[in-house]
């Protein structure tokens, strides 16, 4: 088995999908989890206005609405959380995403004050954060807020991770990578677009340039610029296609380098890091 085949198998990626079937699969998956643990009453997700959170948010709201109808439990709710750092440049996209999702509840937590307070506390301890590390601080503060909300609403935090993100480890460890349940796992980027199109999402929300937008020195830095490969490259790789060797090597390099992000904390019994 080649490394490409191993990666595809590990991430559950498929070359072709039926969007309607995958929508149903994700919704039923979320419903089944909540039914298994009836003390859970909410799904919580941060909404950024990008493709991934828009899709995960819509699937979460669909799952909650169906489960509420089936069980008669009106305590069930989907909570969409806006988590700007100060003023968000693409705020209108966030509002458009919320209008499309139609969540039961919308909360806004501006993380800037918390991030600056943490940065100042570290500075007083003699640690000056780089712009890159400050970006990770933002991602972790956002997740901290979501877990606080979930803790107070008997909820679970929904993640937006998918195969095209997992393969490169393009997420912050214990930030946006630290979630409870990931309904998009297995899908690549273009497949996520197919699901949103099938759901009637406004095109500009899934055709916009993907960006984590965490760094102050490089605002709205495109994911593809940071990775050195395009999402089309990554999707082709996950679909089993043959790529230029340099591109394939870059993708595989990211996968190996970020293996620790896809695992629980390393123990004495782990040996993947010795490769």
From Swiss-Prot:
It holds the Pfam family NAD_synthase. It comes from the Bacteria. Mg(2+) binds at residues 52, 165. GO terms for biological process: NAD biosynthetic process. Deamido-NAD(+) binds at residues 140, 173, 180, 260-261. One of its GO terms (molecular function) is ATP binding. Gene3D superfamilies: HUPs. One of its GO terms (cellular component) is cytoplasm. InterPro entries: NAD/GMP_synthase, NAD_synthase, NH(3)-dep_NAD(+)_synth, Rossmann-like_a/b/a_fold. It is an enzyme of class 6 (ligase). ATP binds at residues 46-53, 160, 189, 211. It catalyses: deamido-NAD(+) + NH4(+) + ATP = AMP + diphosphate + NAD(+) + H(+). Keywords: ATP-binding, Ligase, Magnesium, Metal-binding, NAD, Nucleotide-binding. Its EC number is 6.3.1.5. Transmembrane segments: none annotated. Pathway: Cofactor biosynthesis; NAD(+) biosynthesis; NAD(+) from deamido-NAD(+) (ammonia route): step 1/1. Homodimer. Belongs to the NAD synthetase family. Catalyzes the ATP-dependent amidation of deamido-NAD to form NAD. Uses ammonia as a nitrogen source. This is NH(3)-dependent NAD(+) synthetase. It comes from Salmonella paratyphi B (strain ATCC BAA-1250 / SPB7). The gene is nadE.
